[in-house]
């Protein structure tokens, strides 16, 4: 990669929109920039560089980006040395359109070449013109780049990039490319590196995690349909790793071995986020979702048999083209049967470039809004009822930062239970000093609401952790590049992982 010749201590700010993939990519961008000599801008400081890591999934993504870019135009005019970069899915989609709409932007880069950002910034500054570089295929796994992690106690670990599905409403495969899987050994090495830094919770990321193992980049790594279940079990062998989560699985490829691994691996959390999208078989077919509601509900039954207290969450789209009232009632019926702990609900958003955008029978906004409100009302009722079942229960929390908007006025702190539920608690009782984000407490739930639980009873136990120590010091992990490029010959093999991790590397 090109080196960057720049004034020392240029400050940066990364603004992230969209999914967990983007959040994790932004950690990579921060790591790259800090390796190139930038420092993160302090709160309230005008940065020398602003990087937008964009999303293209929602209809208003374009308006949000270009509106924010227009707000920066006066700052750029006042300070011509300031640089603005736009990356992510919307940049991959819009390409040269970005600098046509916002000519004060210095760099546009895509989803496949985030590692080029420092060099592109240097080139734009040297050439005094915008640099637009969009690649059609992934240049290197993001894991081969350094990362400046946002959290002292929880970390993202990407197991794959891209997606082989062809959902008619989704533009992500066109922007992220076909699925490419990382080697198990590289993934576990990254997890171990995070744990070595004090991280206690890891979330494995992929557009379709259950497909992991069928698209390895390394030609010497054989296809393995059981690779994801083996990966979960291998994570269970890492000392100091207390919680493992993953997102997102696809119902069409959800297999029994994964359910068994979840139930039998103690540090894999009793939580499953599995997108439904619609409860109508007719709509699922139009979406090209390749499963039907009976299969979806069957998976939930198996998960609850293996893990009776598992919290199951989902994604639902309301108002897909051609959705009838009968179709919508099918969705409500699945919601009633599944009794999701919570649901991320969306009104269908037409995305240019997707098959659904060209479908007939696009629904009126008023119809979609009315159905959306009915779905929200039903799901909130179910969520409250499910949360009320936990009143009086003892739960273990990983204390979190920034999860409670009213914590200052209520004198509470917040944490996540093992099943992912948000709990606000009073840091009083059997404490071992000050409670910090990253510490672990045990509390008894005293009240329930649709979006959270409350524990106003005294804390039963408090365990201080290395993650809490790091948070208190203001230190977050900075993980080095891990793994090799996409099928390229590697120079030297990584150190072998312990045999008991149980996953072929």
From Swiss-Prot:
Keywords: 4Fe-4S, Cytoplasm, Iron, Iron-sulfur, Metal-binding, S-adenosyl-L-methionine, Transferase, tRNA processing. Residues 149-385 form the Radical SAM core domain. Its cofactor is [4Fe-4S] cluster. [4Fe-4S] cluster 1 binds at residues 19, 55, 89. It is found in: Cytoplasm. Coiled coil: none annotated. Its EC number is 2.8.4.3. One of its GO terms (cellular component) is cytosol. It comes from the Bacteria. Residues 388-459 form the TRAM domain. Binds 2 [4Fe-4S] clusters. One cluster is coordinated with 3 cysteines and an exchangeable S-adenosyl-L-methionine. [4Fe-4S] cluster 2 binds at residues 163, 167, 170. It holds the Pfam family UPF0004. Its main location: cytoplasm. Residues 10-126 form the MTTase N-terminal domain. It catalyses: N(6)-dimethylallyladenosine(37) in tRNA + (sulfur carrier)-SH + AH2 + 2 S-adenosyl-L-methionine = 2-methylsulfanyl-N(6)-dimethylallyladenosine(37) in tRNA + (sulfur carrier)-H + 5'-deoxyadenosine + L-methionine + A + S-adenosyl-L-homocysteine + 2 H(+). PANTHER family: CDK5 REGULATORY SUBUNIT-ASSOCIATED PROTEIN 1, MITOCHONDRIAL TRNA METHYLTHIOTRANSFERASE CDK5RAP1. Catalyzes the methylthiolation of N6-(dimethylallyl)adenosine (i(6)A), leading to the formation of 2-methylthio-N6-(dimethylallyl)adenosine (ms(2)i(6)A) at position 37 in tRNAs that read codons beginning with uridine. Monomer. Belongs to the methylthiotransferase family. MiaB subfamily. HAMAP family: tRNA_metthiotr_MiaB. This is tRNA-2-methylthio-N(6)-dimethylallyladenosine synthase. It comes from Rhodococcus jostii (strain RHA1).
């Amino acid at each position: 990669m090109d080196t960057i010749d720049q004034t020392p201590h240029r400050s940066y700010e990364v603004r992230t929109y969209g999914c967990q993939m983007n959040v994790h990519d932004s950690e990579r961008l921060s790591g790259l920039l800090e390796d190139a000599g930038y420092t993160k801008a302090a709160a309230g400081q005008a940065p020398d560089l602003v990087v937008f890591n964009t999303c293209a999934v929602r209809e208003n993504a374009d308006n949000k980006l270009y509106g924010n870019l227009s707000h920066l135009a006066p700052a750029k005019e006042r300070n011509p040395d300031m640089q603005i970069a736009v990356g992510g899915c919307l940049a991959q989609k819009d390409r040269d359109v970005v600098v046509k709409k916002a000519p004060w932007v210095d760099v546009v880069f895509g989803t496949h070449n985030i590692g080029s950002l420092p060099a592109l910034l240097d080139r734009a500054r040297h050439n005094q013109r915008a640099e637009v570089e969009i690649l059609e295929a992934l240049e290197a796994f993001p894991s081969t780049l350094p990362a400046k992690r946002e959290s002292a106690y929880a970390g993202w670990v990407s197991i794959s990039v891209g997606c082989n599905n062809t959902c008619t409403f989704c533009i992500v495969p066109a922007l992220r490319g076909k699925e490419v899987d990382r080697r198990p050994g590289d993934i576990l090495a990254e997890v171990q590196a995070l744990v070595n830094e004090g991280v206690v919770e890891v979330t494995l990321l992929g557009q379709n995690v259950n497909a992991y193992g069928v698209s390895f980049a390394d030609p010497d790594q054989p296809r393995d349909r059981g690779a994801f279940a083996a990966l979960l079990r291998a994570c269970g062998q890492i000392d100091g790793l207390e919680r493992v989560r993953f997102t997102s699985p696809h119902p069409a490829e959800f297999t029994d071995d994964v359910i068994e691994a979840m139930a039998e691996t103690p540090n894999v959390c009793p939580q499953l986020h599995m997108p439904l999208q619609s409860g109508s078989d007719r709509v699922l077919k139009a979406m090209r979702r390749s499963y039907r509601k009976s299969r979806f509900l069957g998976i939930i039954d198996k998960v609850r048999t293996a893990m009776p207290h598992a919290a199951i969450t989902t994604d639902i789209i309301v108002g897909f083209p051609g959705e009838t009232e009968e179709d919508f009632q099918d969705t409500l019926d699945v919601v009633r049967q599944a009794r999701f702990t919570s649901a991320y609900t969306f009104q269908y958003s037409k995305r240019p470039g997707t098959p659904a955008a060209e479908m007939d029978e696009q629904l009126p906004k008023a119809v979609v809004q009315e159905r959306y409100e009915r779905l929200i009302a039903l799901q909130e009722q179910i969520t409250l009822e499910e949360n009320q079942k936990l009143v009086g229960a003892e739960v273990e929390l990983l204390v979190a930062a920034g999860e409670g908007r009213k914590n200052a006025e209520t004198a509470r702190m917040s944490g996540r239970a093992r099943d992912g539920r948000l709990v606000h608690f009073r840091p009083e009782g059997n404490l071992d000093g000050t409670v910090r984000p990253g510490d672990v407490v045990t509390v008894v739930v005293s009240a329930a609401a649709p979006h959270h639980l409350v524990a106003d009873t005294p804390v039963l136990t408090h365990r201080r952790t290395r993650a809490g120590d790091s948070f208190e010091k203001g230190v977050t992990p900075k993980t080095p590049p891990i793994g090799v490029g996409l099928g390229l010959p590697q120079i030297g093999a990584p150190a072998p992982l312990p045999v008991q991790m149980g996953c072929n590397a």
